[in-house]
C-alpha cells in the first residue's frame, strides 16, 4: 500500500513539474517557432503555433538589416560579456580566497561590510551617483565606462559560492605548498584555481547569462553612442524604430539568435555548472 501511495505521489509530482516546465518554456518555444513565419502570417494569425511554411528569410533579413547593425551589436555583446565574465571570475575568486585563507584583523567585520555593499542593487539609488562619478572622469559614455562599473558591482552570490567551495578544500594542500616555498599568490594561482574549476565554471555561466541579458545599464551608457549598443538594447530599440516596429518577424528572429549563446554556454559547461553549484552551496 505504501509503495502504491509513493508511486502515485511521484506520478503527481512529475506531472506537476512537467506542466510547470511547459508553462515556463512555452513562450521561448513560441518565439523560436514563430521566427520561421512570415510577418504577414504573424500579424494575421498570431494564435497559430506552427507556421504554414517555414522560411529562413527572417534570419537573413536580421543579419543584413538596415535598421540596426546586427553584426556590430553581436560583437559588442560578446566583448562586453566576456570582459564581465573575466572580471566576475577574478574578483569573486580573489575576494573569496582572501576572506577564507587570508589572515588580517577584523576579517569577519570587513566581510560583512563588503557583503552589505555588494547587496545594494544597481537601482535608482546607486545609478545616479555612479554615473555622476564616471561623468567627472569622462567615462560615462559607451561600454568602456560600464566595464569599469562592473569591477565594483560583482554579485555577492558569486563570492559566497566560491568561498564555500574553497572552504571545502583540505587546508593540508596549501600547508604543504607553503613549506615548499610557495607564496600566498602562487598558491592561489597554481593550486587553488585549478582545484576550483567547477565553481569557476558556475560563476562564468551565471556571469555570462547576467551580462548578456543586461538591459538597464547598457541602455543608459550607450544612449549617446548607438554604435556600442548590445543585442538586447538593439532589439528593444528595433521595436520602437518607426517602420521596423511592425516587423515582428525580425524581432522574433533576433530574439531567438540572442538566446542561442546562453544555451551554447550552458551546454558546454553543464557538467561543471551542476557540480560547482551543489558544492559551493555546502558551506559559506
PLM features: what roles do these ranges have?
Residues 2-284:
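A structural signal for multi-pass alpha-helical bundles of membrane permease subunits
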Amino acid at each position: 500500500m505504501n509503495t502504491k501511495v509513493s508511486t502515485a505521489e511521484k506520478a503527481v509530482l512529475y506531472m506537476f513539474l512537467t506542466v510547470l516546465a511547459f508553462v515556463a518554456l512555452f513562450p521561448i518555444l513560441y518565439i523560436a517557432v514563430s521566427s520561421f513565419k512570415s510577418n504577414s502570417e504573424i500579424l494575421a494569425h498570431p494564435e497559430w503555433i506552427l507556421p504554414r511554411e517555414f522560411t529562413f528569410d527572417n534570419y537573413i533579413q536580421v543579419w543584413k538589416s538596415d535598421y540596426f547593425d546586427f553584426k556590430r551589436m553581436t560583437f559588442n555583446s560578446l566583448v562586453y560579456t566576456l570582459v564581465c565574465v573575466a572580471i566576475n571570475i577574478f574578483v569573486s575568486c580573489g575576494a573569496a580566497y582572501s576572506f577564507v585563507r587570508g589572515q588580517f584583523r577584523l576579517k569577519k567585520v570587513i566581510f560583512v561590510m563588503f557583503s552589505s555593499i555588494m547587496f545594494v542593487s544597481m537601482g535608482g539609488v546607486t545609478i545616479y551617483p555612479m554615473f555622476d562619478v564616471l561623468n567627472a572622469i569622462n567615462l560615462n559614455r559607451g561600454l568602456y565606462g560600464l566595464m569599469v562599473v562592473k569591477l565594483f558591482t560583482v554579485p555577492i552570490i558569486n563570492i559566497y559560492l566560491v568561498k564555500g567551495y574553497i572552504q571545502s578544500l583540505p587546508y593540508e594542500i596549501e600547508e604543504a605548498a607553503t613549506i615548499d616555498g610557495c607564496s600566498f599568490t602562487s598558491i592561489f594561482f597554481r593550486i587553488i584555481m585549478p582545484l576550483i574549476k567547477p565553481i569557476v565554471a558556475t560563476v562564468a555561466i551565471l556571469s555570462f547569462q547576467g551580462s548578456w541579458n543586461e538591459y538597464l545599464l547598457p541602455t543608459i551608457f550607450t544612449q549617446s553612442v548607438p554604435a556600442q549598443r548590445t543585442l538586447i538594447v538593439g532589439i528593444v530599440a528595433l521595436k520602437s524604430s518607426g517602420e521596423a516596429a511592425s516587423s515582428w518577424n525580425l524581432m522574433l528572429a533576433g530574439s531567438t539568435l540572442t538566446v542561442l549563446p546562453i544555451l551554447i554556454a550552458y551546454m558546454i559547461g553543464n557538467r561543471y555548472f551542476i557540480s560547482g553549484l551543489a558544492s559551493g552551496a555546502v558551506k559559506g
